[in-house]
Amino acid sequence: MIWEHRTLKRRRLRDLPPVDAVAPIDDGDPVPDRLVPLGYEKKDTAGSLGLLVGSIVVGFALDGLYRRVHGFMFRHRVSNIGSHRGSILSAMIVWDFLYYWNHRWMHEVRLFWADHVAHHSGRRYNLSTALRQTWSGVLTTWVYWPMSLLGYRYSTFLKARQLNLLYQYWIHTEAIDRLPEPIEKIFNTPSHHRVHHGANKQYIDKNYGGILIIWDRFFKTFEPEIRQVQYGLTKNIRTNNPVKMAYGEFVNIAKDVVSADNLNDRLKYVFAGPGWQPDTIRPEPAFS
């Protein structure tokens, strides 16, 4: 944190303002605290830590279920590629590819977005932002089942997941500008991930990769960091309560489903994009 503070203090402001931001700064935005590092805010950081603690508790509670599901899939594996020498490297690549699609669907399907919105809810972008982890990841664990079918053991599966999460921790910072071009071309970097957390129109639904950015380049979801990033949601939830951040969107979905006039609308409120509304031809997502 101190390193981030010193780096940000030295850095000059970017030349281009966020003229296309869709979540303009207002009186409700968090105010920096003089006694905490630059770029941090006490309530924002406390909310991030609360989400981390909840995520760890939920993870421990569901670990037995995850192991049983993996064991069943592993016994019915169609390949033993995961047992070969160097399997951890291939596991990391396979995990990252599946992570790209998992992450993308989290932004494109409202039910999955409800699982992910807490991570994007902060209007600060710093290392504590990476701690905003899901409490309902069970909704999308099926995305990674192919790894079990390919013959990756549960221990290898966990290592690939943990290394992916660890890599993504350091890219949640404004203190690192662009890295050398070869790195920016292949890997996810702080610059690329700042774009992903942006509420600017041009940054919405971009840069889903975990470790590698090549998936975004290949599937046409890549966007470079050009203008200053406006962090948060297009409609900020204005709370640092971990429970509200973790489950608030599920409550909103339930309210919309109850108020819907027909089955088709009810299903779309759950499975269409986050910003879907009845009779909307090309909806704007609530945030991606």
Tell me what each language-model feature is.
Residues M1-M73, H84-Y100:
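Specific transmembrane helices
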